[in-house]
Amino acid sequence: SDHFYDLCDEMGLIVWQDLMFACNVYDLTEEFEENITKEITENVKRLRHHASLGLWCGNNEMESAWDHWPEVQSESKYLRADYIKMFEHVVPKAVKAADSETFFWQSSPSSGGCFDEPDDENRGDCHYWDVWHGQKPFTDYQKHYFRFCSEFGFQSFPCLKTVESFTEEKDRNIFSRVMEKHQKNPAANGKILYYLSENFRYPENFRKLLYVSQILQGMAMKYGVDHWRRHRGRCMGTLYWQINDNWPVASWASIDY
């Protein structure tokens, strides 16, 4: 909402503003090109005056997806050409026409576009998920010196009060059907237990398990943030995934629903 940007202006917060394209491929028809040009123009004009606006980012994980995601790699080469046309030409042209001052970045992560090693740690921004998805230990953060880490994170369970809002007593087991439905990352409840077993003794009850998972999340995030802050100059910033939730769920959020 516009109120969000007003608050960021007042509080001195800088907004990394993604355009609404993420984790997908698009067939760039004439009609779609016309539609996105109008959408971008309208929204850039709506937000361009905000002091909090740090940059426009063309998309999330669409450039790097061609290197890492089998479902994207199997797509037609013509869709790859459409990606280049869309995010190297159509989208930046529309943004610059409406806002010539704010920096535009084609994709995240990226080394500058056109599929030029988007995960290069020496250029651009990187997303780092070996801690969590790769189940690497927290110490693995210390092996990486990104120029800017624009996404990393770690999951925890919500508070007991939140869990009670969507479960009955018989469901209060992290592998129950209800608890699994309130977890959208496959096998993630097991990942939390794996990391918990590496760092703590197993909690004696369900309430303590939820709480300890949050302590674990805090430890993971602190480890990464502390490492990259120590190397300021080489790494000039981080963004973590994520701050909050829009429904009661186990997730990467720091703030419970």
Enumerate the language-model features and the residues they cover.
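Active-site mouth of glycoside hydrolases
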Residues: 1-103, 108-110, 114-115, 238
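Substrate-binding clefts and catalytic carboxylate motifs of secreted carbohydrate-active enzymes
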Residues: 56, 93-96, 106-257
